[in-house]
Amino acid sequence: VSDSGRCAAADPHQRGLIAREAVALLHIMKLAVGIRDIAHLRAVQQARAKADPPLRHHTRNMPRRGDEIVDGGSIYWVIAGAVMARQAVREIIADTWDDGSPCAGLVLDPVLVPVSPRLTRPFQGWRYLAAEDAPPDLAALPRGVGEAAMPADMQRALRELGLL
């Protein structure tokens, strides 16, 4: 196994000769500071990815449990006090800030997946989020839960934000 915890090419685990130990799925939760809604986050990320690909989020510290995150985990975005969306974390790399100082780069899938909103208190940095504590994707919930009781203009606004 290499220093990064990934399998080297000659590793018998990779060739399927030895059963690989299961890695627990883990997510990260992060405040999207200055972001109004999912559409705004999408626009900011698209501009950032175009200017400096690949799409990534910089963070001061390298997550110690990174292998658990890149093995199917996501970053859950807290927008206006609630967890609102998630993005798959494809890779965690050593990166640099604009001033050249070292940081970690979370390489993200460009697709933002709306989740069932969950209020949360503000916090600094990021937090680990266990898979069983993560809010479900909105698409996984039964269609129309509470939708019929909403006024048409509210439904339209929520659809525009990608929440319905």
Feature locations, PLM:
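Short, extreme N-terminal leader segments that mark the start of a protein/domain
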Residues: 2, 7, 15-43
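A generic structural signal for short beta-strands and their flanking turns/coil linkers
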Residues: 27, 71, 102-104
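Residues that form generic nucleotide/phosphate-binding pockets
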Residues: 41-48, 157
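Aromatic- and Lys/Arg-enriched surface recognition patch
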Residues: 88-136
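Well-ordered alpha/beta subsegment
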Residues: 123-164
